[in-house]
UniProtKB/Swiss-Prot annotation:
Lineage: Eukaryota, Metazoa, Chordata, Craniata, Vertebrata
Top-rank taxon: Eukaryota
Native source species: Mus musculus (Mouse)
InterPro entries given in the database record: GPCR_Rhodpsn (IPR000276), GPCR_Rhodpsn_7TM (IPR017452), Olfact_rcpt (IPR000725)
Disulfide cross-links: 100-192
Protein name per its UniProtKB record: Olfactory receptor 5P62
Membrane topology: Multi-pass membrane protein
GO-annotated biological processes: G protein-coupled receptor signaling pathway; sensory perception of smell
Extracellular side: 1-28, 79-102, 158-199, 262-274
Entry keyword Ribosomal protein: no
């Protein structure tokens, strides 16, 4: 039952997600592609977590943050992808009102945690390159745990903020969501409440949050680049810069998509374009991060070789 009639007011109890396409053949193709990407995402990020856990040489702050980034990537992808895969195989792509809120809050939680973790990793690189002699002191286990805990608290606050707005909206119909998951923007379009003030508050908050965390990342890299330029040897500069390229690539991909979806004016792009970029943000980035950090990191590649070598000896 999609609606409850309460006197003169109709309340929506479930929503229909329109998804990516109505074409049955294309649905099957997308199901196969997205399922493969999701399985690789889970395998890649889980392998990263396990490799860091069993390799003593990877028990450093940078890899501590990386293991949490991998778990957050799995959570972000898992908050949307399983439901999307089920909807590819069913004719009526419905999700309950409560399920929609849970999906939205999960995506908001993991998305915000990733912001803070990327900022923490930028600080880690700043200390490692600009203050190497004080690295063990400034990036102690206690500091790392506090930074990660702060990231999860920030994610919880963001999820609470977004969830509060969602459950404060009234939905009287229609109930067809023009997206593949319950994102806040298409949900506001369906609300029969006056969302004009909420839309301004949410847009301002999203823009401020994104640009503030980006600023926190840019400032450390400004000092990092100055320090790298002062290194006389070409080999030294390349080695110092190589430790930052993976993180910079991840930051560029993540912030580029977030700014497009949540910061740029809605009039500058269509809903279909928003779906494509959201798919990249929810599905492609989580599968790319393990590749970005492993292919450009000799320590991870060496640790992986050691694990394979040990298994061949057993």
């Amino acid at each position: 039952m999609a609606f409850i009639y309460n006197g003169s007011q109709t309340t929506v109890t479930e929503f229909i997600l329109l998804g990516l396409t109505d074409d049955p053949v294309l649905k099957v193709i997308l199901f196969c592609i997205i399922l493969c990407i999701y399985l690789v995402t889970v395998f890649g990020n889980l392998s990263t977590i396990l490799l860091i856990g069993v390799s003593s040489k990877l028990h450093h702050p940078m890899y501590f943050f990386l293991s949490h980034l991998a778990s957050v990537d799995m959570g972000l992808s898992s908050s949307v992808t399983p439901n999307m895969l089920v909807n590819f195989l069913t004719e009526k792509n419905t999700i309950s009102y409560l399920g929609c809120g849970i999906q939205l809050s999960s995506a908001a939680f993991f998305g915000a945690v990733e912001f803070f973790l990327l900022a923490a990793m930028a600080y880690d690189r700043l200390v490692a390159i600009c203050n190497p002699l004080l690295y063990s002191t400034k990036m102690s286990s206690q500091v790392c745990i506090q930074l990660v805990a702060g990231s999860y608290v920030g994610g919880f606050l963001n999820a609470s903020f977004v969830t509060h707005f969602f459950f404060s909206f009234l939905f009287c119909g229609p109930n067809r969501v023009n997206h593949f998951f319950c994102d806040l923007s298409p949900m506001m379009e369906l609300s029969c409440s006056d969302v004009s003030i909420s839309e301004i508050v949410i847009s301002f908050s999203a823009g401020s949050f994104t640009m503030t965390t980006l600023f926190v990342i840019v400032i450390p890299y400004f000092y990092i680049f100055i320090t790298i330029l002062k290194i006389r040897s070409t080999e030294g500069r390349q080695k110092a810069f190589s430790t930052c390229t993976s993180h910079l690539t991840a930051v560029t991909l993540y912030y580029g998509t977030i700014i497009f979806i949540y910061v740029m004016p809605k009039s500058t792009y269509s809903r279909d374009q928003n779906k494509v970029v959201s798919l990249f943000y929810m599905l492609v980035i989580p599968v790319l991060n393990p590749l970005i950090y492993s292919l450009r990191n000799n320590e991870i590649k060496d640790a992986l070789k050691r694990q394979f070598y040990r298994k061949t000896l057993l």
